[in-house]
Amino acid sequence: RDTLKNAQKGRILSAPELLDVLHLIRGIRGILQYDRSISVPHDNLQDLISTLSVSTEAEKKIAACINEYGEVTDNASPALRQIRMQKRQAEADISAAVNRFLADHAASVVDSIVTYRQDRAVILVKSSEKNSIQGLVYGDSASGQASYVEPASLIGPNNRKQELLSKEKEEIDRILALCSAAVGSTAEQDISNLETCALLDSLFAKAQWGKERNGIAASLT
């Protein structure tokens, strides 16, 4: 309910919140499909079920952008797909630059595993060697025997990745805003759907309880 109210107020929902809304919409669709498939008379419930409505536009938008894990997919927009392709290339460039540095400075390197400082790939080298390596120093290890260095050959690829990460965030925010707007446009109906589902769930739970105990409905005369 809070998620729907936030969308109604124009706030941008997170990808996991949008996935929750998608589950609600699909749940409503499932109830309506089940209602059409059963032949047993259920007039007492029909008035309730008839108030349910599927938010088709929001369902389509969310399903096209958010995967089952609550993540924005590459195919959410052509721009995002392109940015992520470029980001993967930047990561490959970083990996290649690291491998070249490790091969050329094997005697200076303490650990061949890439570490990240301030979201930038750096390499752990002997502190005694840090001033002989062209690049940026991000501090020393706890022991003081090694230093985190961003070699000059990594600065360009790291900058490129940071630029792409910023663009990726902007595009994701744009996509989330569009999906949230679609949810907001039908939020009032979906809040009503949620309340109806809660009532139906309560009624079915009571019916199941009575069935398990061979109960019968009282008749007032």
For the regions a language model picked out, list residue spans one by one:
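N-terminal accessory segments that target, anchor, or regulate ATP-driven/P-loop NTPase machines
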Residues: 95, 101-108, 113-115, 143-155, ...
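Glycine/charge-rich, flexible interdomain linkers and switch-proximal surface loops
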Residues: 105-120, 183, 187, 194, ...
